[in-house]
Each structure stands twice: as C-alpha cells, then as structure tokens.
Amino acid sequence: MSYILAEALNFVRRGISHLNYWGASHSLSADNYWESNFQGFPRLLSDSSKAPSTIRTVQVLEDDVDDIAIQYNKIVRGPLDYLLAIPGKDIRSKLIDSFNIWLQLPEEKLSIVKDIINLLHTASLLIDDIQDASRLRRGKPVAHDVYGVAQTINSANYAYYLQQARLKEIGDPRAFEIFTRSLLDLHLGQGMDLYWRDMVVCPTEEEYTRMVMYKTGGLFNLALDLMRIQSRKNTDFSKLVELLGVIFQIRDDYMNLQSGLYAEKKGLMEDLTEGKFSYPIIHSIRASPESSELLDILKQRTEDEAVKIRAVKIMESTGSFQYTRETLSRLSAEARGYVKKLETSLGPNPGIHKILDLLEVEYPTNEKGRV
C-alpha cells in the first residue's frame, strides 16, 4: 500500500476513534454529530437509514474503511492518472538524473524527488490546459474534456497536497519551505503569463524572461534544492538551473509555432489560439510597433489555419524566428560554459550536455516555415 493511501486510511481511522470516544460520553445521534462537526466531509455510510442511532454504537470494519479510501483515491486521481498514462518528454526526470551525477543521492532518495516533481508537473499541466482552453495534450484529448473541469481542478489540487505530504520522507525540515517557495514562484509566473494574455499587454523580453524563471524554473529549482539538502555536496546550481529553464521555455515557444510534430501533439500553433505572448511573438510585435496586425490576430484567439500561417509570415518578416534561434544558441553556449566550470571541481557530467543537445532546435525546411 502506498504511503499516501496509508496516511489517508490513518486519517479515517482516527476519525472513527474520535466518533467512538464522543459517542461514549454524549447522548448524540450520528446524524447530528456529523452535521455539527464534519460539515462538508463525505459520510462513510451513504445510506443514513443504515446508520446506527447513536455514536456509541458506530462500528465500521477496517476492511470497509480501506475499501472506501481506495475508492475515493482512485476517483479523485482519475484526471491525474489519465495524463500520467500518456508518455511525455520526461525532461525533468532526465535533468534530475543528470544533476545526480554530481550530487550522488542513493536511488531511494532520488526516486522520491522524481515522484514529487513528476506529480507536481502533471498537476500543473491539468490546470494549464484548463486555463489555456487547450484541446490536446501529448496527442490525446485534454483531461478536462474527459473528466470535466471541476473534477480536473480538484484532482490537480489533490496532487499538490499528496506531494506536500511526502516531504517528510525526505527527513529535512527545510523541504517544506523549499516546496512552498517553489510553488509560490510557479503560481506567480503563471499568473503574470495569464495577465499579459488576458489584458493583451505585450511584455518586454526582460519581463518575459523573469516570468519564465518563476514559472518554468520553479519546478527545476524545487528538484535541485530537494536534492541538495540530501546530498553531502552543497554546490549552488541556481544560475545553471535558471538558464535551463529559460532555454526550455523559449524552445517550447519556438516549437509551438515551427514544429509539425508539436502540432500533432498539442494542436497547430496553439499559442496563437490561446492568445499567448510567447518569445517569437513578443519580438515580432516590438520589432514592428507601427503595425498592429499580429497583435490583432492574437486578440482573435483564432483556430483558422490560414490566419495562423499569416501570423507566422509576419513573424518571419520581422526575423523573429531567426532571432529566437540566435537567442537559444547564445543561452545554450552560456549554459555549456557554466557546466564546464562546474566540471572542473565536480567532475565530468555527460548527462547535462545530453540535455542541452536535446534542447537544440532544428531549422525550418518547408514552405510554411515548420519542420
């Protein structure tokens, strides 16, 4: 039985003991006690006609409690498990493995960090797809189209607290502060991204980069900080992690508008339908302030392929894709240089170099400007 499920069962058992204690000293019906003390919580017995008349006679077999907790957990996790079953790029797990070449955590500790990050990332995608009104995720229908918006939001929130509960497995009180700070950063970054989109405010490149450090870098930093507090080595990787987060997000922005494979997995140029101010779009708008055409297209949240292709042509005319590739090349070179400095004291790390190789972008090869 998993740690989290065991904790849930213990909670229910403590509740039953509490009920029995109060029932022994108060003449109170089960219905009245529940309504006065546990409003909003589900009953263990859904049919009140089958409930005993007084609390002192309440008896619930432990097997029944186990079955109920298992059933609730399975239902609530539905959207989360749905997305977990669809393979992703797994870049975060690869990143954790790469840094562990230096930090040398044992497998059992590393596994806990991976699980926490994977569940948090998956939960954030559930929310992200709702906020962006997405239709596809990893080539499949988004979870909220299968399970509904309300259940998907609840499943994502449930996942956050599931992982918070796992922090005690790390065995360091600093883990909770690290976890809280990282989730705050993630939500701050996401909030600014949504604000610019919904208010139709085009940020500067500097503002966008800062947002990415919060939004994308939040989980990257969480993973590395949880690893560091368990390692005998205490090297500060924050600069490298920030660079990797920015590279990852700008590359994702580029691929959204240029990659045919991305279109199959996420939808054709979905950032345009979302109305998102991604890196190439920001550059194009600011490179041609006298023209409002691209901004006007962005406002429409269009799903029309011809209009999207027109938007791409505008970005090509302002050199925005070339500029984005040059930015990625510069950031990658900076990251590689930083890795080499770290390697002089920590030893070779081929894993990080492979990550950077994976984040290299291809050049467009067809008439639509998409590879």
From Swiss-Prot:
Mg(2+) 1 binds at residues 128, 132. GO terms for biological process: paxilline biosynthetic process. It is found in: Peroxisome. One of its GO terms (molecular function) is dimethylallyltranstransferase activity. Its EC number is 2.5.1.-, 2.5.1.1, 2.5.1.29, 2.5.1.10. The record marks 160 as: Important for determining product chain length. Dimethylallyl diphosphate binds at residues 137, 215-216, 249, 256, 266, 276. Keywords: Isoprene biosynthesis, Magnesium, Metal-binding, Peroxisome, Transferase. Mg(2+) 3 binds at residue 252. Mg(2+) 2 binds at residues 128, 132. Disulfide bonds: none annotated. It catalyses: isopentenyl diphosphate + dimethylallyl diphosphate = (2E)-geranyl diphosphate + diphosphate; isopentenyl diphosphate + (2E)-geranyl diphosphate = (2E,6E)-farnesyl diphosphate + diphosphate; isopentenyl diphosphate + (2E,6E)-farnesyl diphosphate = (2E,6E,10E)-geranylgeranyl diphosphate + diphosphate. Its cofactor is Mg(2+). Isopentenyl diphosphate binds at residues 89, 92, 121, 138. Pathway: Secondary metabolite biosynthesis. InterPro entries: Isoprenoid_synthase_dom_sf, Polyprenyl_synt, Polyprenyl_synt_CS. Its main location: other. Binds 3 Mg(2+) ions per subunit. Disruption phenotype: Impairs the production of paxilline. One of its GO terms (cellular component) is peroxisome. A motif (Peroxisomal targeting signal) lies at residues 369-371. Geranylgeranyl pyrophosphate synthase; part of the gene cluster that mediates the biosynthesis of paxilline, a mycotoxin that acts as an inhibitor of mammalian maxi-K channels. PaxG, the geranylgeranyl diphosphate (GGPP) synthase is proposed to catalyze the first step in paxilline biosynthesis. Condensation of indole-3-glycerol phosphate with GGPP by paxC then forms 3-geranylgeranylindole (3-GGI), followed by epoxidation and cyclization of this intermediate (by paxM and paxB) to form paspaline. Belongs to the FPP/GGPP synthase family. This is Geranylgeranyl pyrophosphate synthase paxG. It comes from Penicillium paxilli. The gene is paxG.
